[in-house]
Every structure is written in structure tokens, then in C-alpha cells.
């Protein structure tokens, strides 16, 4: 930042922090209410960012009677390191903020620490999640299926910081404001998606109309309105990643941010789907997901069904109708590996408006999707900017 030209200083972790007590409570010993809050390592790894505001009402509480005795409760500026994970996210750190008298314990698989001398609020939370710091931890991690890092090894790392609190404050405040902006952007996206879910229900249950003179919607079975193409898997010898042949859509992994993407091709296609068809994931963890095909022509695997509208229904209306039906369809999924069968799709009872109203409905939801995508792109930009700044602001 302009006006700061002092060199940064570096100290051993062991000279910067003292270690604090943690508990070993499992999730089963936590609840939504209680007198003492608990910071679980799983939440540090996945749920929380670099800074945890203690006013966050999603922080779990310790069930009464399970609290630690003689515990030195955490304070503003304390950090909590997750010492165990399934991958190299070991070492993910949060800094606590706005404790204001709340009783907080550090939980299972965490290393709580207290600075021995002052730092700017939030500086340590951001610094300890930079690649500059985290790369020190990677060679110190131990384990095969599960990775962990010991207090002794954490103590070997170096903590770098500007010499002046003022420069630390500039860095942490700037990143915090950027995080707040990204959080607000996420809430906008969530609100738009919630609105879309409500609008889909209102439209397809005929609670609202897009026609000046509402007309009766006709009752059909889905099988009266579409042709349904099931997929077929290939052995590895029948596909390639050299872009030779026809794109091969293998499953939910081919859906990225609401778009179809291709990473495999085949020279022996048999089960075709075409641009504009609605694809329904019918097997596996992504079962029930719906996407519109953007490639000209593809072969689909068993994980997909392709729905192609006939002359009674527009392809865009088919896409949004299938999206509305997906939860209902998924509830009928069966088998050890969750699966949707053809009969479930074809036998869905649906109501269909005239073609001109179908087009109005599809245009409305298309504009809504465009708005959601624009806000998602804005969030991606904010996240990318933050990532770049995290690399450039710290040395």
C-alpha cells in the first residue's frame, strides 16, 4: 500500500503464539443451544472463512454437561488451526472476532493459539491461509488416508508480517471488505435462486398466468409430449480424450455451472442427444440434475436420459418443466445406486398451456437464468480478485 516502505519481519511460530487447550467433543455432543460455543475442525475446514465472527448464529453449542472444566475460553484475535483433514487443507486457520463475552471452546482436531504480542485484527487469519504460509506446512504433514500436523511441526513454521500495525490493518481491512462484498453477492444469488424455485412452483401449478386471458392448461402424461432417449456406457477402449469423434457425455461431472462440458469423445456413438435437448441425470450422486445440451450432437452414457419435446411443447418449456418435476421424479429413485427409470419420467402427469404461453414462460425463466448467471460471474470475479490479492499482499 502507498506510504508503507518498511521491510517485513519474520518470527518462528513458537515465538509468536502460545498453545491453548482444545476439547475432543464429537458432533453428537453439540447442539443448536447451550451456554458454550464449540469450533469443530470440520467447520474450520469447510464452513468458515479466514475470519469467524462470533455473532454467527450457526456456530454449534456444547450440550449442557459436556463443557470442559477450568477452560481458558477463547478471545478476540485467537486463531484456531485444523490439524487433521483428508487432504492438504490441513492447517486451514480461522481468527476469532467479536467474541464480546461469549464462551467459546476449540474442538476436536484443532490447535487453538493466542498471539504473544499484538497484531492488527484479522491479519493472522488472512496471513495463515495464504499459499506463502501454507506451503511451509505441506512437507510437515503426516499420514496416508488422513493427513495431520502436530503442534511441534506447526511450531517450526515462520510468521511474516509488516513491522507496523498500521500496514497490517490496511491489508486485513481491505481483504475483510472484499470478503463482505463476496458474502453479500452470495446472498443475492441465493435469493434469486430461491425466487426462481418459488416462481417455478407458482407457474407450473397454475397459481400465476402469463396470458391476458388465462386459458385452461391441458392434462398429459410426459410420455405424450417427449421422446425419451436412454444412454449407454462405453468401455475405455471405445472412447478417447483427443477430441476424435462425437462428444461422449458420461454423467453429472459433465455439468459445470449449469452448462454441459465435454472431456471424452467416441467414434462409435449410438445413443444420440442433440443441441437443445433436456438432459436428466438418472443415476448416481447427481441424480435429478437437469441441464440443456449446448453441443450439436453427443452420445450419452447410462447416467443420462435425453428428453426431446414434440410439436406440442417447445424445447425451452420442456427444460423448465423438467426442472420443476425433478424433485418429484427423484423421490421415486430406487436401488443401491440411486436411479430414475424411464417409466417414472414418462408417467409424470403434467399440464401444458398453449404454445404462445409456453414461449412467454420460457422467456421469463431464461431472463431470470441470465440474471443469476451474471451475478454468479460477478462473484467469481470477486473470488479471483481475492485469490490474486492473497498472493500479492503477503510476502
Locate each region found by the language model.
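Hydrophobic aliphatic residues
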Residues: 17, 128, 203, 226-229, ...
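A short beta-sheet element
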Residues: 40-42, 51, 57-129, 250-252, ...
Amino acid at each position: 500500500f502507498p506510504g508503507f516502505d518498511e521491510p517485513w519481519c519474520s518470527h518462528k511460530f513458537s515465538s509468536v503464539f502460545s498453545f491453548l487447550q482444545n476439547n475432543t467433543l464429537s458432533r453428537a455432543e453439540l447442539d443448536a443451544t447451550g451456554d458454550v460455543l464449540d469450533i469443530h475442525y470440520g467447520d474450520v475446514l469447510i464452513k468458515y472463512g479466514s475470519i469467524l465472527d462470533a455473532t454467527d448464529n450457526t456456530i454449534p453449542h456444547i450440550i449442557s454437561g459436556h463443557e470442559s472444566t477450568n477452560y481458558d475460553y477463547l478471545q478476540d484475535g485467537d486463531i484456531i488451526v485444523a490439524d487433521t483433514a483428508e487432504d492438504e487443507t490441513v492447517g486451514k486457520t480461522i481468527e476469532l472476532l467479536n467474541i464480546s463475552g461469549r464462551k467459546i471452546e476449540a474442538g476436536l482436531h484443532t490447535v487453538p493459539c493466542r498471539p504473544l504480542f499484538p497484531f492488527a485484527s484479522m491479519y493472522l487469519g488472512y496471513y495463515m491461509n495464504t499459499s506463502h504460509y501454507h506451503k511451509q506446512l505441506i512437507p510437515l504433514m503426516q499420514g496416508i488416508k488422513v493427513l495431520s500436523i502436530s503442534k511441534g511441526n506447526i511450531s517450526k513454521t515462520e510468521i511474516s508480517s509488516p513491522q507496523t500495525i498500521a500496514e497490517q490493518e490496511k491489508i486485513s481491512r481491505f481483504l475483510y471488505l472484499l470478503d463482505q462484498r463476496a458474502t453479500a453477492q452470495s446472498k443475492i444469488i441465493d435469493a434469486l435462486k430461491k425466487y426462481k424455485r418459488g416462481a417455478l412452483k407458482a407457474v407450473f401449478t397454475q397459481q400465476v398466468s402469463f396470458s391476458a386471458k388465462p386459458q385452461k392448461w391441458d392434462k398429459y402424461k410426459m410420455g405424450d409430449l417427449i421422446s425419451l432417449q436412454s444412454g449407454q456406457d462405453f468401455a475405455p477402449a471405445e472412447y478417447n480424450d483427443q477430441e476424435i469423434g462425437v462428444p461422449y457425455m458420461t454423467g453429472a461431472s459433465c455439468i459445470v455451472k449449469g452448462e454441459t462440458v465435454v472431456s471424452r469423445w467416441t467414434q462409435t456413438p449410438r445413443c444420440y442427444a442433440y443441441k437443445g435437448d433436456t438432459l436428466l441425470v438418472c443415476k448416481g450422486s447427481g441424480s435429478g440434475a437437469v441441464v440443456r445440451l449446448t453441443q450439436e450432437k453427443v452420445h450419452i452414457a447410462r447416467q443420462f436420459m435425453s428428453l426431446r419435446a414434440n410439436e406440442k411443447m417447445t424445447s425451452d418449456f420442456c427444460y423448465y418443466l423438467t426442472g420443476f418435476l425433478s424433485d418429484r421424479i427423484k423421490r421415486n429413485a430406487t436401488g443401491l445406486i440411486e436411479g430414475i427409470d424411464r417409466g417414472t419420467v414418462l408417467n409424470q402427469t403434467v399440464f401444458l398451456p398453449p404454445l404462445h404461453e409456453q414461449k412467454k414462460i420460457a422467456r421469463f425463466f431464461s431472463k431470470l437464468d441470465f440474471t443469476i448467471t451474471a451475478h454468479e460471474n460477478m462473484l467469481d470475479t470477486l473470488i479471483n480478485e481475492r485469490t490474486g490479492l492473497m498472493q500479492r499482499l503477503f510476502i
